[in-house]
């Protein structure tokens, strides 16, 4: 039944919540496979907050013990991600976790910002707020994701 419902949709949107609980519920009910099949059929997967970052290999999340720490994602998108990076403490910790080798290179997304991925690659950044952006973070650098996308496109 769920396969039929998801198969008829053009977009799946996750509104967020507790990232760890959400991923565990998805695993328990085999929804990760359903979402993967939908993704492979071209259905758009989207979300905000926890719902935006769950698709990555790794997440910086406060959903376990209310403290920011690395959390395994569902591996649809390479690297790591954190939402709410307009909170400077979260952004600093994300950068620190990457520099320390606890997270792979990744994307930090400010509140009010959306990132469009096509075939697993970031291709557009949209912001509804002035001075809010998304960033590509490595062990050595933090740059605007828009700049990183321009470099990818040569």
Per-range role (PLM):
Residues 1-7, 11:
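Single conserved hydrophobic/aromatic residue that forms the stacking wall/gate
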Residues 15, 21-92:
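Class I SAM-dependent methyltransferase SAM-binding "motif I" and its flanking Rossmann-like core
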Residues 17, 50-51, 113, 120:
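Alpha-helix/helix-capping structural signal
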Residues 59-61, 65-154:
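C-terminal and late-domain segments of enzyme folds
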């Amino acid at each position: 039944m769920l396969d039929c419902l998801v198969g008829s949709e053009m977009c799946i949107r996750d509104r967020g919540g507790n990232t760890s609980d959400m991923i565990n519920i998805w695993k328990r009910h085999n929804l990760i496979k359903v979402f993967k099949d939908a993704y492979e059929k071209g259905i758009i997967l989207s979300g905000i907050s926890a719902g935006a970052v769950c698709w990555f290999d790794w997440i910086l999340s406060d959903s376990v013990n209310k403290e920011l720490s690395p959390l395994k994602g569902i591996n649809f998108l390479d690297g790591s991600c954190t939402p709410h990076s307009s909170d400077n403490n979260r952004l600093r910790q994300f950068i620190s976790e990457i520099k320390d080798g606890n997270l792979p290179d990744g994307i930090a997304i400010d509140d009010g910002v959306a990132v469009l991925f096509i075939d697993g690659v970031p291709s557009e950044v949209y912001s509804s707020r002035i001075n809010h952006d998304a960033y590509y973070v490595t062990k050595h650098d933090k740059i605007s994701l828009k700049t990183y996308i321009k470099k990818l496109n040569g």
